[in-house]
């Protein structure tokens, strides 16, 4: 039976806070009772049976384990679920009962170190490169035991579409990228070309052009594997590292995720590394092409991409650049004396990989970069200690649920905890849930980054991180503006609570450090980027080499990050009015202008990290209201309310499809279904913007939907994915279904039900 381990170290692991926040799964053949084994198998069968209609796992294995460990059984004395008829009004008693049941359930799945473990997955390109990398390096059986392989195979088959292909993400239509990577991974894991649905998957691949039609990232991976040729890839020249730092194309100006992908990719490209050509690789060369491998025109293949994958087509100027580098640049750089430049560039590239590894404790910024850095370190020295340290951190990325074993983007431990604290505090029930808040407070304090990156971090194109919070945990090390702001808010709110209830508050200097990070990130237009100050020209996006992402080349400002920063600074200003007051006032004023300028004519804001207009509008409204705006003095807020009211469904909820993010047009979920997370965002926005002062009826109706949707155990149902990134890929946050209904109910009780009668 699989067990989730919390806060545990092990051989080859390094931590700066004793592994607080670490979560990883291990298989224990002796764990569990026969009844638990039977229940787990039932949950797996249910998911597989419904996999085409319900594509997101509900994180049921983790929830089952933690409820047992926290001694919450089926006989716990919780009130019965409230169900209100259309004719009934919401009463304080009904609302408090629902809140109590919701927080009781959510407290029962809190880890002992204070965070709430949860899935953060959904893309169908995180897992397969790891399988390929471990196969290339010969470490597959060392890292993946029989149970790992069994659950990975389960996951990939569970998320195969009815047409035989696999999507870019689990809710998406079939793509060559997802299909080819998944097919290859299954073959590596021992599935035969005719096993189960493999033949159907291969048919989809061949019917859509074969492996030559895989996008650029896929071409890179199957080349490194040996099932494709470097001559069929557009160049990834490491020589960009040799450009002067002021050059617009210098990697130091890239978005950190782009830079950290390019570092190891350029190293492997410059080495023209290819893994061992085994019998399996030779078989893949026959299985996945529509013509003999030795007759493929690799130059033509460079820019061949299946139409199903083509979200961001290359502009002509980009193809001209790749053509020049391919036909001219590579010839020069592989001949003496120009080859000396390549050797120098490779040295710089791998040194940057070293720096990222060491400063992230071999976690790296995310799963895509992790696998690339791992294989780069193996190519550099297969017997190195660094490679062993990389292997030791792989389990940090595993997540297991009823649909199988998957790889997370990384983890959302801190992000979820900061929201959860605010949600519980909004309900005014802190006395009853003091132990929950105390543990969460401990986690927040232990997760703040206490130091900047090592050495001359500016020379390594890193920004300050002392005082920040990461998306996940301290060991990760990467500062994020909105995570820092939400962490600051949570810590400030808890500092106002009695220490005997929630524990001692953070030292004042640590609040100051957090504010320093936030202020350092604001752009000249008033907006806030996510990780680092904006430092590149927007036209560089013309050279985005991926065909399936948008806005991936440079750091940019986000409505969500700006809204969070405004809230954090506004709350800090109330508690510490003398600290950098003029700077904070100017910062907030500029941020307000940015938010107002980014509003769409229909009153909405586009959200880049959640789906989509509902999400962006929530952050914008929260930012404006935290800084003194309301429906009486802000046209932006009145327009926001009008927008949200126009999208309320006949069932009183809101439900927005991921297609909104892709197409940049608000799109309802199929069948006009309501999504409880998005409904909660809309209700929070309307509540804080002051809609209840105009007409509270839409809020009452939406709140009744939340109350009636609660499950018997106090949980809320898992519905459609609500996270997104780079406009075209979804990400599931399984804790959102608990956090945001709790938060919306708490604010409704305080600001609507107790202030505005029916």
Swiss-Prot record:
Expression is induced as follows: Down-regulated by methyl jasmonate (MeJA). No effect of gibberellin A3 (GA3).
Q: Does the keyword Signal apply?
A: no
GO BP annotations, alphabetical order: pentacyclic triterpenoid biosynthetic process
Identify which top EC class this enzyme belongs to.
isomerase
Briefly state the protein's biological role.
Oxidosqualene cyclase involved in the biosynthesis of lupeol. Required for the production of betulinic acid.
- Could you tell me which PANTHER family the record lists for this protein? TERPENE CYCLASE/MUTASE FAMILY MEMBER, TERPENE CYCLASE_MUTASE FAMILY MEMBER
Q: Which family does it belong to?
A: Belongs to the terpene cyclase/mutase family.
Q: What is this protein called?
A: Lupeol synthase
